[in-house]
Swiss-Prot record:
PROSITE patterns: RIBOSOMAL_S12 (PS00055)
General function of this protein: With S4 and S5 plays an important role in translational accuracy. Located at the interface of the 30S and 50S subunits.
Organism of this sequence: Oltmannsiellopsis viridis (Marine flagellate)
Gene name as annotated: rps12
Signal peptide positions on this chain: none
Superkingdom field: Eukaryota
Name used for this protein in its record: Small ribosomal subunit protein uS12c
Length: 125
């Protein structure tokens, strides 16, 4: 426990937290343009072809973003909205593409968890 005089001399240090998504610059989402759309493989023990995109953000960063859901319509020069959130089995992928906004279409035929994949409520007919 420091004395009052010690605290006068040098105040207590604030604990600084490091951000997990620096490219967003404290914004909830950022717009960007796809520079490359490709598939990559996850680390052991998983096996798949995960769809990812290299995105140039309006903040000036170029990041790798995961494209969630089954099937997508993204290609080079597509304008996308990017949010934070890493993919556990893809090293270096710390961002997600938001489905159903800008040039990104929602997931076709999705019935459950629609809000996460940009799908409107199906009409009852």
């Amino acid at each position: 426990m420091p004395t009052v005089q010690q605290l006068v001399r040098s105040a207590r240090q604030k604990i600084t937290t490091k951000t997990k998504s620096p490219a967003l610059k404290s914004c909830p989402q950022r717009r960007g343009v796809c520079t490359r759309v490709y598939t990559t493989t996850p680390k052991k023990p998983n096996s798949a072809l995960r769809k990812v995109a290299r995105v140039r953000l309006t903040s000036g960063f170029e990041v790798t973003a995961y494209i969630p859901g089954i099937g997508h319509n993204l290609q080079e020069h597509s304008v996308v909205l990017v949010r934070g959130g890493k993919v556990k089995d893809l090293p270096g992928v710390r961002y997600h593409v938001v489905r159903g906004t800008l040039d990104t279409a929602g997931v076709k035929g999705r019935v459950n968890g629609r809000s996460k994949y940009g799908v409107k409520r199906p009409s009852d007919s």
